[in-house]
């Protein structure tokens, strides 16, 4: 879930302008996006490849494999969202071996640059708006995947102008790998 700042200042300005026009119930023309970005989510960032993935999605997949291991299975759908700053990821990680949720949480709490905010209640997580201007990568909504006993789901958010979204996921995976050695 990539903010418009990932597309540059002109795109940030366009979101602000489109929001004003939408609130005034006026016609909106998109210049930097394929569709209206104000009050919308666009599941398309960069050019499409023949396989249906976009260049941005393939970049995320390939960077993860390059840093971790080429055998790591990764898929992604990149979505441009009407937020000025900060990217977010909904991540599912499948482990080879059994794990405890407490061990994963402890590992993440001790990972450099990460801050766990995982209160299982309304508002007990960090949003893109709250992450803007902060150096940490925030990890929330840590839970076991109820469809796969060897997997977890996470919500990861960081200020993309300070840290890259793909880097965050990779650093979390690296921390887990180091803990197994």
Question: Model segments located where?
Answer:
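Active-site-lining helix/loop region of Rossmann-like oxidoreductase modules
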Residues: 1-107
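C-terminal active-site/capping subdomain that shapes the small-molecule cofactor and substrate pocket
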Residues: 72-181
């Amino acid at each position: 879930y990539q903010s418009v700042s990932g597309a540059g200042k002109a795109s940030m300005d366009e979101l602000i302008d489109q929001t004003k026009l939408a609130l005034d119930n006026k016609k909106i023309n998109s210049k930097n996006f394929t569709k209206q970005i104000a009050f919308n989510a666009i599941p398309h960032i960069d050019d499409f490849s023949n396989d249906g993935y976009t260049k941005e999605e393939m970049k995320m997949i390939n960077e993860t494999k390059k840093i971790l291991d080429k055998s790591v299975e990764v898929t992604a759908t990149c979505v441009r969202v009407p937020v000025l700053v900060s990217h977010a990821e909904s991540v599912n990680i499948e482990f080879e071996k059994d794990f405890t949720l407490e061990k994963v949480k402890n590992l993440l709490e001790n990972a450099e640059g990460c801050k766990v905010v995982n209160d299982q209640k309304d508002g007990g997580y960090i949003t893109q708006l709250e992450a803007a201007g902060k150096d940490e990568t925030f990890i929330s909504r840590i839970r076991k995947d109820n469809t796969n006993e060897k997997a977890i789901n996470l919500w990861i958010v960081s200020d993309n102008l300070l840290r890259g979204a793909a880097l965050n996921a990779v650093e979390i995976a690296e921390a887990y790998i180091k803990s197994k050695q």
